C-alpha cells in the first residue's frame, strides 16, 4: 500500500505523523520504504539517518523530487508499505504522488483556517481520482488540545462535513513534546516511552491499514 501524507498547509504534522506511523509499522515487522518528497526540508531523511545509528527497527528511505509517479508505482510491490511525505504545499511531487497513492492523509489543526484549505485541496483530489480511481482521501486532526472540554474537533468536523471528497478519521494526535523530542533521537514518540502517543498512532494505523 502507498500512503501519502500531503496537503496545502505547512506545519500541521505531516512529517511527524508519517515518521511515527513508519516506526510503528517497522516495529510490527513490516518492510517499509519511506519516500521523502520534501527534500528541501529534509525532516524525513534526517530522521532516517539518525535512526540508522540506533538499535531500533530499521526501514529504507529515499529522497525524490519532481514527478514521483513512476518511482512510486515501480516500488509498490517491493515493500509491504510505502510511506510518502511531500510536505505542506501544492507541488509537482504532491500531485504526481496522488496518481500512485492508495491513500492520501491530510493532517489539519482543528480550526477554521485549516478547514478552509480543504476547500482548495478538494478539486486537486478530484482531478487525481479521475486518473487514479483507487485513491482515498482522509483527514486526521493533528496537534489537538489535550483538554477534553475544548470542542475544536467537533466544531471543525461540522465545518468540513459537506466536503464529500474527504473521510475524516476518528483517530487524532494531541500536542505532545514527545513527538518533537523523538524526531531528534531518530525514534518515535512511542519508542521514547510515551504511552499516550503510542495509543494515538496505533489507533491511526488500525483505522487506515486494517
Range-by-range predicted roles:
Residues 2, 6-8, 12, 23-95, ...:
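P-loop/Walker-type NTP enzyme "switch/lid" segment
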Residues 17:
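Hydrophobic positions on the alpha1 helix immediately C-terminal to the Walker A/P-loop
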Residues 93-112:
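Inter-motif core of Ras-like GTPase G domains
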Residues 109, 136-151, 171-181:
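G-domain G4 guanine-recognition motif of GTPases
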Residues 118-133:
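Conserved C-terminal guanine-recognition region of P-loop GTPase G domains, centered on the G4
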Residues 156-187:
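Beta-strand-loop-alpha "switch" segments that mediate conformational coupling across diverse proteins
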Residues 183-198:
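C-terminal boundary of histidine-terminating zinc-finger modules
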Amino acid at each position: 500500500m502507498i500512503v501519502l501524507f500531503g496537503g496545502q498547509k505547512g506545519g500541521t504534522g505531516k512529517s511527524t505523523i508519517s515518521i511515527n506511523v513508519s516506526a510503528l509499522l517497522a516495529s510490527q515487522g513490516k518492510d517499509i520504504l519511506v519516500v521523502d518528497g520534501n527534500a528541501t526540508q529534509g525532516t524525513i531523511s534526517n530522521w532516517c539517518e539518525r535512526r540508522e545509528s540506533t538499535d531500533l527497527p530499521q526501514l529504507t528511505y529515499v529522497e525524490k523530487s519532481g514527478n514521483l509517479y513512476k518511482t512510486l508505482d515501480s516500488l509498490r510491490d517491493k515493500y509491504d508499505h510505502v510511506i510518502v511525505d511531500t510536505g505542506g504545499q501544492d507541488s509537482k511531487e504532491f500531485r504526481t504522488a496522488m496518481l500512485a497513492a492508495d491513500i492520501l492523509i491530510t493532517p489539519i489543526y482543528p480550526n477554521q483556517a485549516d478547514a478552509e484549505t480543504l476547500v482548495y485541496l478538494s478539486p486537486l483530489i478530484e482531478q487525481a481520482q479521475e486518473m487514479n480511481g483507487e485513491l482515498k482521501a482522509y483527514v486526521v486532526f493533528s496537534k489537538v488540545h489535550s483538554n477534553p472540554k475544548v470542542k475544536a474537533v467537533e466544531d471543525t468536523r461540522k465545518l468540513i462535513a459537506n466536503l464529500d471528497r474527504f473521510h475524516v478519521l476518528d483517530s487524532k494526535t494531541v500536542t505532545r513534546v514527545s513527538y518533537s523530542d523523538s524526531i531528534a533521537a531518530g525514534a518515535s514518540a512511542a519508542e521514547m516511552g510515551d504511552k499516550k502517543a503510542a495509543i494515538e498512532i496505533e489507533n491511526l494505523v488500525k483505522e487506515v491499514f486494517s
